[in-house]
Design a protein with these regions (language model features):
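Active-site glycine-centered loops adjacent to acidic/histidine catalytic or metal-binding residues
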Residues: 254
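Conserved beta-strand-loop-beta-strand element in the redox core of flavoprotein oxidoreductases
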Residues: 77-95
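Active-site/ligand-binding neighborhood in enzyme catalytic cores
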Residues: 1-80
Length: 276
């Protein structure tokens, strides 16, 4: 932390435990974009809240008000850019557009786009966090935690794969599920496989005195796409921004801002203001 270790004490829980990686591998610009003074103070003062119906409900409500709502569960087979237009192939049919804004993971864009050499080069630099969650119930009559808890000792690369936080979503709601969160990857270490990571999280819960009944949900995420410090310093973002509009293609989504809702939405609004 450049000789300022107290910053790590303030930032490590909302950054590393929230799945954004370790401070020795993630460029500081990402940390500062997310944990600006206002956001950091929310965590310090415990001024936090959640959406009662989950964040997906926000997008569902927005989508219901759109003139052209999102088309869900559509498989895009390929995208070509020819004759000043963009051709999108869906279920064997071609739809042609004036331009396209890509918000899906850019590192996979070459899999279905007629990607240029520059797109392939830049987007191959992207990595992401393997951030896993399980939701478990506790055996009746056994110990039940009163509140969510961080395990700060597990937020270091040396404890990769161990549970960093367990979470109780609702206040005064006995016997609700408990969610566990782990990271399985670090730039300088071997990737921990999914099943091993899950087992480590549950062993940590047992160490905390929790007697697991069953797992009711589990998920591994494509989480927080980013580039590492060498590519960041070499101007990765400047190079991608310089491509905006080429072949009627624009790039947005998490990688162009940060892996949370606010920064992603702000970038999207800025992109539209600049080019449309």
């Amino acid at each position: 932390m450049n000789g300022v270790p107290l910053c790590q004490d303030i930032w490590i829980a909302p950054f590393t435990a929230f799945g954004y990686g370790y401070f020795d591998e993630i460029p500081a610009a990402y940390v500062l974009k997310y944990l600006d003074f206002e956001t950091a103070m929310y965590f310090v003062n415990k001024n936090l809240w959640t959406w009662i119906d989950g964040t997906q409900s926000i997008y569902e409500c927005v989508n219901n008000r759109l003139k052209h709502p999102a088309r869900l569960n559509v498989k895009i087979e390929k995208v070509t850019r020819e004759n000043g237009k963009v051709q999108v192939y869906i279920d064997g049919k071609m739809e042609e557009y004036d331009a396209i804004i890509v918000t899906s993971p850019l590192q996979y864009l070459p899999d279905y786009f007629d990607a240029t050499a520059k797109e392939k080069e830049l987007f191959s630099k992207i990595d992401y966090e393997r951030y896993d969650v399980t939701a478990i119930t506790i055996k009746k009559g056994s110990y039940y935690p009163e509140m969510s808890s961080y395990i700060f000792d597990n937020m270091q690369p040396e404890r990769l794969g161990h549970m960093m936080v367990f979470y109780l979503r609702w206040k005064n709601e006995p016997n609700q599920v408990i969610s566990t969160y782990i990271l399985r990857n670090h730039k300088g270490k071997e990737l921990i496989d999914y099943e091993t990571g899950k087992k480590m999280a549950w062993e940590d819960l047992k160490t905390c005195g929790v007697d697991i009944d069953k797992c009711v949900y589990e998920r591994k995420w494509y989480y927080f796409p980013h580039v590492f410090e060498k590519d960041y310093a070499a101007g990765w973002y400047d190079k991608v921004e310089a491509m905006q509009g080429n072949l009627n293609t624009y790039y947005a989504g998490e990688i162009m801002s940060f892996g949370d809702m606010e920064e992603t939405v702000q970038y999207s609004k800025d992109l539209v203001a600049r080019y449309f």
